[in-house]
Amino acid sequence: MKVFYDSDFKLDALKEKTIAVIGYGSQGRAQSLNMKDSGLNVVVGLRKNGASWNNAKADGHNVMTIEEAAEKADIIHILIPDELQAEVYESQIKPYLKEGKTLSFSHGFNIHYGFIVPPKGVNVVLVAPKSPGKMVRRTYEEGFGVPGLICIEIDATNNAFDIVSAMAKGIGLSRAGVIQTTFKEETETDLFGEQAVLCGGVTELIKAGFETLVEAGYAPEMAYFETCHELKLIVDLIYQKGFKNMWNDVSNTAEYGGLTRRSRIVTADSKAAMKEILREIQDGRFTKEFLLEKQVSYAHLKSMRRLEGDLQIEEVGAKLRKMCGLEKEE
């Protein structure tokens, strides 16, 4: 898989173009400011006079309604939540799409599953930082960047690569490295990573470990340190050095215990469950379930959020994070 860097990309394809960033959350703010600071012509499309409108104004952006931005722009970069995109697209963006324009995303969800179907003659691309928005902005300001992905679903103008690569360069992604993939691959791997490992798997593993120690009579504070707080140390080692060097950096006791016991935690059944989660993503079952949840105003999701907030590990964690001076990071 080829990795592109700054020297591989040029901004030329966007020099005379207007980019409308739709949405001003974490990614919207970071990506729009980075492109603006790279010398590109950026406008921000938002609901008029909302909190994001005022924030974008304060950051020095040319802010307008979504309809005005969609009409004005050559490239429309949609960065509002996945579940809102199709509705906003149909009512506020689609009427202003003309041949030669480019529709851009940072997640392929709505294109891949067919909730947004662009008209003929419109490019469809994706540029996705592989990092939270705050890190996208901070590393750019420090003169570097975060890695990212680019995809081209439809190349109606025969220069979609030039456009999406220029966006990646403007955001600062090519400073760290950019990989070209597909909407299908980006969407399905992103959802799987979130559900099975990064957000779902890891949190359930932490909770199970914490509860095991507490139920055995150990102090909740000790349980938190050993199953949650110290996780960052290990993740940072893996992030920076890989698995092999992580093992080299921990004690022999930790290495031997981890290598000989890990397969009893993540078993063949665990991997089978992961495969089923992946099938649900691939065949659209998860997407259908998520959209049904939206139709009932996220009742189940809200209930799960309340239950998570009531966990003992949350109470203990809040106390220890304050003790460690970490509360400012939350």
Curated annotation (Swiss-Prot):
It catalyses: (2R)-2,3-dihydroxy-3-methylbutanoate + NADP(+) = (2S)-2-acetolactate + NADPH + H(+); (2R,3R)-2,3-dihydroxy-3-methylpentanoate + NADP(+) = (S)-2-ethyl-2-hydroxy-3-oxobutanoate + NADPH + H(+). Gene3D superfamilies: 6.10.240.10, NAD(P)-binding Rossmann-like Domain. Its cofactor is Mg(2+). Keywords: Amino-acid biosynthesis, Branched-chain amino acid biosynthesis, Magnesium, Metal-binding, NADP, Oxidoreductase. Mg(2+) 2 binds at residues 190, 226, 230. Its EC number is 1.1.1.86. Residues 182-327 form the KARI C-terminal knotted domain. NADP(+) binds at residues 24-27, 47, 52, 82-85, 133. GO terms for molecular function: ketol-acid reductoisomerase activity; magnesium ion binding; NADP binding. Pfam families: KARI_C (PF01450), KARI_N (PF07991). The active site is at residue 107. Binds 2 magnesium ions per subunit. GO terms for biological process: isoleucine biosynthetic process; L-valine biosynthetic process. Pathway: Amino-acid biosynthesis; L-isoleucine biosynthesis; L-isoleucine from 2-oxobutanoate: step 2/4; Amino-acid biosynthesis; L-valine biosynthesis; L-valine from pyruvate: step 2/4. Substrate binds at residue 251. The keyword NADP applies. Mg(2+) 1 binds at residues 190, 194. Residues 1-181 form the KARI N-terminal Rossmann domain. Involved in the biosynthesis of branched-chain amino acids (BCAA). Catalyzes an alkyl-migration followed by a ketol-acid reduction of (S)-2-acetolactate (S2AL) to yield (R)-2,3-dihydroxy-isovalerate. In the isomerase reaction, S2AL is rearranged via a Mg-dependent methyl migration to produce 3-hydroxy-3-methyl-2-ketobutyrate (HMKB). In the reductase reaction, this 2-ketoacid undergoes a metal-dependent reduction by NADPH to yield (R)-2,3-dihydroxy-isovalerate. Belongs to the ketol-acid reductoisomerase family. HAMAP family: IlvC. This is Ketol-acid reductoisomerase (NADP(+)). It comes from Methanococcus maripaludis (strain DSM 14266 / JCM 13030 / NBRC 101832 / S2 / LL).
